[in-house]
Amino acid sequence: MNYIPTQTFYGRRWRPRPAFRPWQVPMQPTPTMVTPMLQAPDLQAQQMQQLISAVSALTTKQNVKAPKGQRKQKQQKPKEKKEKQKKKPTXKKKQQQKPKPQAKKKKPGRRERMCMKIENDCIFEVKLDGKVTGYACLVGDKVMKPAHVKGTIDNPDLAKLTYKKSSKYDLECAQIPVHMKSDASKYTHEKPEGHYNWHHGAVQYSXGRFTIPTGAGKPGDSGRPIFDNKGRVVAIVLGGANEGARTALSVVTWTKDMVTRVTPEGTEEWSAALMMCILANTSFPCSSPPCYPCCYEKQPEQTLRMLEDNVNRPGYYELLEASMTCRNRSRHRRSVIEHFNVYKATRPYLAXCADCGDGYFCYSPVAIEKIRDEASDGMLKIQVSAQIGLDKAGTHAHTKMRYMAGHDVQESKRDSLRVYTSAACSIHGTMGHFIVAHCPPGDYLKXSFEDANSHVKACKVQYKHDPLPVGREKFVVRPHFGVELPCTSYQLTTAPTDEEIDMHTPPDIPDRTLLSQTAGNVKITAGGRTIRYNCTCGRDNVGTTSTDKTINTCKIDQCHAAVTSHDKWXFTSPFVPRADQTARKGKVHVPFPLTNVTCRVPLARAPDVTYGKKEVTLRLHPDHPTXFSYRSLGAVPHPYEEWVDKFSERIIPVTEEGIEYQWGNNPPVRLWAQLTTEGKPHGWPHEIIQYYYGLYPAATIAAVSGASLMALLTLAATCCMLATARRKCLTPYALTPGAVVPLTLGLLXCAPRANAASFAETMAYLWDENKTLFWMEXXXXXXALALLACCIKSLICCCKPFSFLVLLSLGASAKAYEHTATIPNVVGFPYKAHIERNXFSPMTLQLEVVXXSLEPTLNLEYITCEYKTVVPSPFIKCCGTSECSSKEQPDYQCKVYTGVYPFMWGGAYCFCDSENTQLSEAYVDRSDVCKHDHALAYKAHTASLKATIRISYGTINQTTEAFVNGEHAVNVGGSKFIFGPISTAWSPFDNKIVVYKDDVYNQDFPPYGSGQPGRFGDIQSRTVESKDLYANTALKLSRPSPGVVHVPYTQTPSGFKYWLKEKGSSLNTKAPFGCKIKTNPVRAMDCAVGSIPVSMDIPDSAFTRVVDAPAVTDLSCQVAVCTHSSDFGXVATLSYKTDKPGKCAVHSHSNVATLQEATVDVKEDGKVTVHFSXXSASPAFKVSVCDAKTTCTAACEPPKDHIVPYGASHNNQVFPDMSGTAMTWVQRMASGLGGLALIAVVVLVLVTCITMRR
């Protein structure tokens, strides 16, 4: 069957009904049935009917407020008759005539009233044996009932329908009868995040989950619908999962094309099943014991035995409540006093305490059983043997506490109760055996009170209390102002909880004082108690008595007497033996449950920040030890963390990739470095060198050193070549006696005076004799140098390399093809492409990643948490032996010790000296805190990337979500886009990860069933409630000390608590590429790594035809200001002419610059200003506006701010970029040096050639 209902409606029954009319309304005649094809709907009649209904409702409201008139008095009696006659019709009419709720109940709010009004027709109760177990809902054209709800629908028409069951959706579905279609509700698949309505108030919808405050829903609500503000059904409730302060709902809901079922982890079905208990092989509802009016007050011992027989049944607590309150079948309101009712069936006890405050052993009435410190806010829950909030009769008394004094229960003032560690603790709550208190750090814990005789009774145990801080600051006093962080605390409520303690029938208490010796006989003084005695003198001196009894011819040493009482329970303490080996027990709720709350923590003083060049200096002023950490946002995070407890100064290196630091509980701060420097890229050579030295010191030193070396080598080579040429010219004349050196050669080779005229004489001779030769001789060298310089300059201009480092846009090509592109996987970095299509005006496409989520596929191996050691009361077999039996408990240990001789406060527990045995047991279980504080061990597999991408083209500007896998297609404005797969298959998660609260750790944990004591995974289970618990804690039982009833044992401390102290930094603080690690589900957000290929199909309708677009001419560009390596730090003015105003796409066709604008509004003969970002000091890039193109040339200056809180919108440079001015100076230097070298080469070649001809 299709589980998507059809939206078919004939009217809405949940609209405001017509108000009651106090006057008689005549019956309207039944209209004649007309075939719908022949009868058109009369719109005017419908409008008139609506108007009449509105006027009637308004008139009724006025009549209600009017004083009683004659007409109203006349109609009062007929009204009563009419109501009496209307009490019989169908169930639907009964529902309309329901009496108003009792005044005691809380008035429902607006949401509840709205839902009740809608639910009045569209939901029906499902009943089993007369009890409501859930609901069925009419949605669209179908009736839907949760499959797990047992029973039949309380409507004869719906009950006889044939339902089809779907185990996948946990639904049973059938077609609604035609006559009931008007009662159905609409449904919708539209679910924007926000608040919705249901029977119990508001439902919050966020991140695909419906949640409610814990306690707002309960078993029996299965099948209830959730409505939006228009009264449409958005989901049907199936159950819930308790997550602390809120409960996540398990629902069936609809998407656009299908039905989905959302089932949070730990979901429980909310069907109100009927709980059954047993009594003498007879079943009965647990809430209604068959022995009415019997209850605990009338038959205490029989009632306790009945409870022990049903202790493991689901309805045990209903049976316990019914037995203790002795209520009749009508349900009473619960109160705080009723929470204490169960304690009337229990009693305090005396237990062994190793240190009763004075360093000596005693049997203390306030013995400390357990100290629980699971609350992260430092609160302790202490269990003692006394009972607080009760008087000695067992009734609730907030100012009293009761304790055991011998065989009797006494009471004292609660105000005398004290708890100490290194100083007095602050007690916040008490109930029964439990105390909740805040204590200062210490190495022991002591509880004490003053008894009825003003004597101090105490017990002291060794316990190290050193609570871990909440957050990142170790504060002592809770601040007035701060920030709220999630934490756990013991909720100060005495209401029943999921936690429980075991109770058992107490043993017989030996008391030697009951025996007295009189004239060779032993007298047993009962004193109104039941005494079990055993005397070895004579025969048949064994039994019980409630009256005084005398044993003739006997001695006290031959008798053993003990008080027996089985009409009360006592806590199953390892310091008190149990009555029998079968360990019959009961259970009692534990107050003050651990719950998720928020704790106010301080905010560290903001540090003094000084920004420097590629570094930031923080001056930290901690008021208490405060955590300071930082990491790089690049591929190698280099995490650093420390606790600072005094004034400190820290210098953090900041790179262009960015860093993130966090001080205390302040939010993390991200900073990026900019390419700031001294000097100017367009100044004199020393300013240019200073500029590049600030950016690239090593490269600048290398370049300047290389250039200087080349210049020196060039000059040296020039001088060497000229000297060689001179030597070759003069050598022949030097070897020939009387030879005369020619004038020209003498001038070129600087011949000696003896062989040639001086330069002045030669030049004077040429001036007198031949002036033409004089000018040719003087200008020859200058002409050669000028010619050489021109040649070198032309050569350099032709071969001038483009800037080594251009703006790469993180690997994205500026010119995208029509159907493919590659965008950077960097949040906030815009990718732009210019798309041209014949007959259409060019269009700019902009793609920008808004958010990215990398979610691994996880397989939960197990959960681990803190364990608790369960030590049942030991069983002591007097004058006999006992045997251990195997039990299905984790890490179960059992041993029998012979030859024990235990004592209790009243004397020896056993009559025999050496034939006694003690059976000691212990096993491991999950601590009660595991529901709130546990770690999950996962195996992580292939991660899938889901990205939120903003797509802009033409008039479309839309954000969409897509899976980056190369298959998932999204439609935006009629265009189809397919993203992925991503270029880099990278994930910050290892194969094994551990999730603890909101932190994720890469950790190699042991597999299931292989845990080691004291290490992570010493206890393991699939869920926090599953029965497959594995434990390995090195639990070993020890022999009890002589004369003491106790169960000593040794055990390795919790591996989970050890792991919490040694776990180190989480992946949240050291993930590379700036990833933000989140949980629920586990994912890495906004990782700046890799590129995303995009395939797209853009229809022609997205383009503007050429004839419709403005024709732009005379386009020119003038850069007003330019700051390179800054986020859109340059401004350019485009001047143009156009034939008509309109919108034009503007785009940069070069990778050197990225424009901020995608489209501009053009006007006739106007100008437009655009912003661009460039990493080059001398960018030159082509810009197009519609079909016109021009070139923008700029001379950019370096940025002024060293550090900024945002990343640049361009790629950082890897190789130094040469400015135009720097290239000009290089050309000039190269021309000069090259000219000198070329002259030297020419001279040397000529001289060599002439010499070789001789």
UniProtKB/Swiss-Prot annotation:
Keywords: Capsid protein, Cleavage on pair of basic residues, Disulfide bond, Fusion of virus membrane with host endosomal membrane, Fusion of virus membrane with host membrane, Glycoprotein, Host cell membrane, Host cytoplasm, Host endoplasmic reticulum, Host Golgi apparatus, Host membrane, Host nucleus, Host-virus interaction, Hydrolase, Ion channel, Ion transport, Lipoprotein, Membrane, Palmitate, Protease, RNA-binding, Serine protease, T=4 icosahedral capsid protein, Transmembrane, Transmembrane helix, Transport, Viral attachment to host cell, Viral attachment to host entry receptor, Viral ion channel, Viral penetration into host cytoplasm, Virion, Virus entry into host cell. Residues 164-169 are annotated as: Interaction with spike glycoprotein E2. Residues 43-77 are annotated as: Host transcription inhibition. The active site is at H148, D170, S222. The record marks W270, S271, R334, S335, A756, A757, A816, Y817 as: Cleavage. Residues 122-270 form the Peptidase S3 domain. Residues 270-694, 757-771, 815-1231 are extracellular. The record marks Y196, N229 as: Involved in dimerization of the capsid protein. Residues 84-110 have a biased composition (Basic residues). Residues 900-917 are annotated as: E1 fusion peptide loop. Residues 716-756, 793, 1253-1254 are cytoplasmic. A lipid is attached at C719, C729, C750, C1249 (S-palmitoyl cysteine). A lipid is attached at C1249 (S-stearoyl cysteine). Residues 95-123 are annotated as: Binding to the viral RNA. PROSITE patterns: ALPHAVIRUS_CP. One of its GO terms (biological process) is symbiont entry into host cell. Residues 108-122 are annotated as: Ribosome-binding. Belongs to the Old World alphaviruses that usually cause fever, maculopapular rash, arthralgia and myalgia. Structural polyprotein: Translated from a subgenomic RNA synthesized during togavirus replication. This is Structural polyprotein. It comes from Ross river virus (strain NB5092) (RRV).
